[in-house]
Each structure stands twice: as structure tokens, then as C-alpha cells.
Regions:
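Glycine-rich phosphate-binding loop signature in dinucleotide/nucleotide-binding domains
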Residues: 87-91, 179-186
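Short, well-ordered beta-to-alpha junction loops that form the rim of enzyme active sites
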Residues: 35-36, 97-101, 122, 172, ...
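Acidic, low-complexity terminal tails and accessory targeting/binding regions
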Residues: 2-30, 39, 43, 126-138, ...
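Active-site catalytic microenvironments for nucleophilic, acid-base chemistry
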Residues: 83, 109-113, 178, 182, ...
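Phosphate-handling substructures
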Residues: 39-68, 110-173, 218-226, 244-249, ...
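Active-site-proximal alpha-helix that buttresses catalytic centers in soluble enzyme cores
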Residues: 22-115, 166-169
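Residues that mark the start of a beta-strand
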Residues: 29, 186-187
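Hydrophobic mid-domain F-helix/FG-region of cytochrome P450s
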Residues: 106, 195-197
Length: 274
């Protein structure tokens, strides 16, 4: 009798993957750091306040990957590195950074001991397509129909020519799968971008699109991802030292602004099985 060539059902397939994940190697812990304040952050924030003047001249002639840190951004990165060296184990087994200049500058300014940073294209900023160099005024006027869809579709919305946050989550899946296999039982640090960190949160904390929309509409101080926000996911219980199968423990803090931090570790009831 010839074996069946039928595919297993979706439910059965997911169950098989979940069973496999219980024995799959995983990192013990990983840390995410958002880059410091950049030229683009300044231009965007001023535009939100009604001043669109920075969206002109040489600023529009460069791709956003070439935006540098501002003076304040460099101070934020240096302060974050100082805090990390004083309050965390900074002896990581692998160091990854987005290829964007603002992330690589931030990584260098952390001054982590023996760090050998690897630029990684999968950690690039979310692709904003035609929105990339558009002021708030242009977004309201030229992209009015897309703004309406953005409010309605939340994380499933993609700017014209760009990525939805749901698509960024798929990139994060690849990063996690690779690093879990390559650095099983080890500690890894990633310096990247705010949208990437939201994608990590969506995957690791497994909150729904509805919850994400609520958090974006009225974010609590500890839920924001500020410049140089530091988010840690760990399988090791910070109180008992016991090692869990999944990433069950999370901490989010902003070294240069304590008001944007949680008061300690949180246990995730729906830790990732990646």
C-alpha cells in the first residue's frame, strides 16, 4: 500500500511544531536596545508639532538608513551603556545590530566589553515605502486615504510600497529561529528600531492586534518604546534562577528616563515557544 501524500491538517501541523519546540534549543536570554534619538526622530517630532521645515534640501536626498544620531541621541546611548555596564551582565555571546547608521552608532556608544558587532539586514527598520521621507503634512494631504486605512487596519496596514507590522513580525520569526538554533543556551543582544521591538513584543508576548491598537492609542509609560529603551526576554527566573522552556520573563526600562520603565521583571503567561 502506497503511503498517503495528503498533508496533515493545519491544526495537526501546529501541534507538531509545538511539540518539536519543547526540545528545540533556545537562547537563554536576549536583550533589545532601540537606537538613540536620530535626525529623523527630530524631523518627525517637529513635523507632528507643525514645523515641517526639516523635510527639505539634503535631508530628502538621503535614504533614511543614513540618518545619524543627534547630540542628544549620542548622550542617550552613552548613558544607556553606562547603566548596562553597572546593572547588567554585559558579557554577551553574540552582538547584532541593524545596518542602519543610527543603530550602529548606538551599538558602538554602548561600549560593551569585548563586543564584536555584526550588522544584520534582517534587523533593518520597517520599510515605510512612500511614507519614508514624507512630513506629517504630506501624509495628511497626499496620503489621506492611506491614513484612514491605517487607523482602521492597525498592524495589518502597510504604507504604499512598504511593510505592515505583521510582515515585520515574519522577519522577526526568522531572526529568532536562527538565533535560537545558533546560540542555544547563550545570551544575545540586538540593537535595532522601535518598530522591530514592537514586532518582537507581538511575537514573544503574543498579544492580539486589538490589544496592540489599544496600547498604541493610550500607551502606559512602561509600554512605550523610547529611544534607547532596553527590553530583556529571559528563560531564567530572576528570583529562583530556575530555567524555563520558554521566554517567560520580560523587563523593559529606559536608563535615561526612569518614568518610562517597569518597576521590575514581569512574568509572561503566554511566553513564546519559538
Amino acid at each position: 500500500m502506497r503511503p498517503s501524500l495528503r498533508r496533515p491538517s493545519a491544526a495537526r501541523g501546529f501541534a507538531y511544531k509545538a511539540a518539536q519546540s519543547l526540545t528545540r534549543p533556545r537562547m537563554e536570554e536576549f536583550v533589545l536596545v532601540r537606537h538613540g534619538e536620530s535626525e529623523g526622530n527630530i524631523a518627525f517630532n517637529r513635523s507632528v508639532a507643525g514645523d515641517h521645515s526639516l523635510y527639505s534640501g539634503a535631508f530628502l536626498e538621503r535614504h533614511s538608513s543614513f540618518w545619524r544620531l543627534s547630540d542628544r541621541g549620542r548622550e542617550q546611548a552613552a548613558a544607556t551603556g553606562e547603566w548596562m555596564r553597572a546593572h547588567m551582565d554585559v558579557n554577551f555571546d553574540a552582538h547584532f545590530s541593524s545596518e542602519y547608521l543610527r543603530a550602529m552608532e548606538t551599538a558602538a556608544l554602548l561600549e560593551l566589553p569585548s563586543a564584536r558587532w555584526r550588522p544584520e539586514v534582517m534587523l533593518r527598520e520597517r520599510d515605510w515605502g512612500e511614507y519614508d521621507l514624507a512630513s506629517q503634512e504630506e501624509r495628511r494631504n497626499a496620503f489621506e486615504q492611506y491614513e484612514a486605512r491605517r487607523r482602521r487596519e492597525s498592524l495589518f496596514w502597510a504604507p504604499p510600497g512598504g511593510e505592515s507590522l505583521a510582515q515585520v513580525v515574519q522577519r522577526i520569526d526568522n531572526v529568532l529561529l536562527y538565533c535560537n538554533r545558533r546560540f542555544g543556551g547563550q545570551r544575545v543582544i540586538f540593537v535595532c528600531h522601535g518598530e522591530l521591538m514592537w514586532a518582537f513584543r507581538l511575537r514573544l508576548e503574543r498579544f492580539s492586534g486589538l490589544v496592540y491598537r489599544e496600547m498604541q492609542a493610550d500607551p502606559r509609560p512602561g509600554e512605550r518604546i523610547n529611544n534607547c529603551q532596553v527590553i530583556t526576554y529571559s528563560r531564567r527566573d530572576p528570583e529562583t534562577g530556575a530555567l524555563e522552556n520558554d521566554f517567560r520573563f520580560m523587563r523593559s526600562l529606559c536608563p535615561w528616563d526612569p518614568s518610562a520603565s517597569y518597576t521590575g521583571w514581569r512574568r509572561l503567561d503566554r511566553g513564546s515557544t519559538l
